[in-house]
């Protein structure tokens, strides 16, 4: 008898595998077909939303990216609605839609983005993509002099953080104050702090008296000084010197200041120096030709500031020439005529507001074109006309004042647009004077710094209504670092 199995019995396991494979493939095909049918009937769906809450309130041209679950036909600006309304543009590619906002949004606010008529290529069904985003809140860094014993909201004493350490009362303190919470946190403290600025995840701090300045870079962790990281002490151009007019590039790649050699007891070689944070961290003079040059005699400076969101600086020289300097040294400087004062920048930073011998103009930094600044009735009817601070492309605030019978100045703040000027209802004590008015990065708030014979105070007010949001017993806040500095007027 033969022991061989029939051929069909040997093939039976293979046939069983084939049947299972065919069945599985059939299920996958059916599932895919059903999904395709459902997708064709329902239209695309929202899969993901990405955005930077802090960037949306501090910088223009920030994007919210909506990602769908499939490729999309082109989406136009007319298909997108933002509530509350905010100027925006729209681009789409593949399965993503980018909503780019023209300017910073309001702090701590919800915005709904709706996209209608969304369709996949070749599919008849349309759908609506809808999402709600929440913007970030804001805070300020304020300099509290050593003589101050309180900070935070008016009437609230003490601070949190490291403010309770021994000896803190004898030191100046840089504190962080959030507008959506009471109290303040000490970020850094040292003797004789004169200026400071945020530099990425660090602080640049200038300190010293009697023409002997020091410049330190302080690492931060959790928003306060990192105790595990040593403070970096910069080597200055001479053994003794005075540092003023500190400014930092928005990207944190560099910072600069006005420096005067005081080794002889007099100020010599006063001019602009910049520090490249990607290089040696050594201050380099900006030469008279407008180029950073090691060892050069520096360009004289009356006022200067970084152009927002660039590595360029706008400089008014000691002879009132205007020069646009590339701090990185990659492009040649551009000379833009002359001016008697730099007020600040408009919107995205391509336009500056400057004072000339014939009036205040808007200077286009791309082509040098000058146009008169809007000055409706009531905006210049005062004996004293102070600094202009732009809130947006069309609106600015300005400190003006009249002389009282006793010779003191009665100051007020005007809010000015193209057609009218109105007084912002901000109370200035009779015994105090306004030393600075500085907009928040999105123009929603103003920091109004006042000084009396006995105290310093910074009031944070709504830029539209003048309503008080917070107050700090401090001399200055970091918002003012965006304004050109040098020879100052309020």
For the regions a language model picked out, list residue spans one by one.
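Acidic, low-complexity Ser/Thr/Gly/Pro-rich repeat segments typical of extracellular/periplasmic
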Residues: 2-139, 166-170, 180-201, 206-208, ...
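Short beta-strand segments enriched in small/hydrophobic residues
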Residues: 138-149
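Structural motif
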Residues: 148-176, 210-221, 261-276, 316-326, ...
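Short coil/turn linkers that define WD40 beta-propeller blade boundaries
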Residues: 180-182, 211, 223, 278-280, ...
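Acidic/hydrophobic-patterned starts of short beta strands in beta-sheet-rich repeat architectures
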Residues: 255, 313, 352, 396-397, ...
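N-terminal low-complexity, intrinsically disordered tails enriched in Ser/Pro/Gly
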Residues: 258-263, 267-287, 294-328, 399-403
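Beta-propeller domains
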Residues: 320-323, 329-354
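Extracellularly exposed regions in secreted/surface proteins, prominently low-complexity, repeat-rich
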Residues: 453-490
């Amino acid at each position: 008898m033969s022991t061989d199995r029939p051929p069909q019995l040997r093939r039976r396991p293979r046939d069983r595998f084939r049947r299972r494979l065919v069945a599985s493939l059939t299920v996958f095909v059916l599932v895919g077909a059903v999904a395709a049918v459902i997708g064709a009937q329902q239209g695309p769906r929202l899969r993901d939303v990405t955005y930077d809450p802090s960037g949306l309130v501090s910088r223009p041209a920030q994007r919210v990216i909506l990602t769908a679950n499939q490729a999309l036909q082109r989406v136009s600006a007319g298909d997108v609605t933002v509530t509350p309304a905010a100027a925006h543009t729209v681009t789409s590619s593949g399965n993503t839609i980018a909503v780019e906002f023209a300017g910073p949004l309001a702090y701590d606010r919800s915005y709904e983005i709706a996209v209608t008529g969304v369709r996949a290529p070749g599919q008849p069904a349309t759908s609506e993509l809808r999402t709600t985003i929440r913007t970030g809140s804001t805070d300020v860094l304020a300099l509290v002099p050593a003589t101050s014993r309180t900070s935070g909201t008016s009437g609230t004493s003490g601070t949190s953080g490291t403010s309770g350490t021994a000896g803190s009362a004898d030191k100046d303190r840089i504190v962080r104050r959030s507008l959506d919470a009471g109290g303040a946190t000490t970020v850094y403290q040292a003797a004789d702090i004169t200026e400071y600025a945020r530099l990425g995840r660090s602080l640049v701090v200038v300190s010293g008296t009697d023409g002997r300045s020091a410049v330190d870079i302080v690492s931060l962790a959790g928003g306060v000084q990192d105790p595990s990281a040593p403070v970096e002490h910069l080597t200055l151009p001479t053994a003794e010197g005075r540092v003023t007019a500190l400014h930092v590039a928005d990207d944190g790649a560099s910072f600069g200041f006005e420096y005067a050699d005081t080794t002889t007891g007099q100020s010599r070689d006063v001019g602009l120096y910049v520090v490249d944070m990607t290089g040696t961290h050594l201050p380099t003079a900006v030469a008279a030709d407008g180029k950073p040059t090691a060892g050069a005699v520096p360009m004289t400076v009356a006022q200067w500031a970084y152009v927002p969101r660039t590595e360029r600086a706008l400089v008014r020289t000691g002879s009132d020439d205007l020069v646009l300097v590339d701090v990185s040294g990659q492009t040649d400087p551009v000379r833009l005529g002359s001016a008697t004062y730099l007020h600040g920048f408009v919107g995205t930073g391509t336009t500056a507001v400057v004072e000339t011998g014939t009036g205040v103009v808007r200077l286009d930094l791309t082509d040098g074109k000058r146009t008169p600044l809007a000055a409706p009735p009531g905006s210049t009817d005062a004996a004293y006309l102070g600094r202009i601070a732009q809130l947006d492309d069309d609106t600015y605030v300005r400190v003006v004042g009249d002389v009282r019978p006793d010779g003191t100045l009665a100051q007020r703040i005007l809010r000015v647009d193209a057609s009218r000027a109105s007084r912002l209802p901000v109370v200035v004590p009779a015994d105090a004077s306004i030393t600075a008015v500085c907009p928040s990065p999105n123009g929603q708030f103003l920091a109004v710094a006042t000084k009396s014979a006995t105290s310093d105070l910074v009031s944070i007010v709504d830029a539209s209504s003048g309503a008080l949001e917070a107050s700090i017993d401090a001399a200055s806040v970091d918002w003012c670092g965006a304004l050109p500095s040098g020879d100052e007027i309020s």
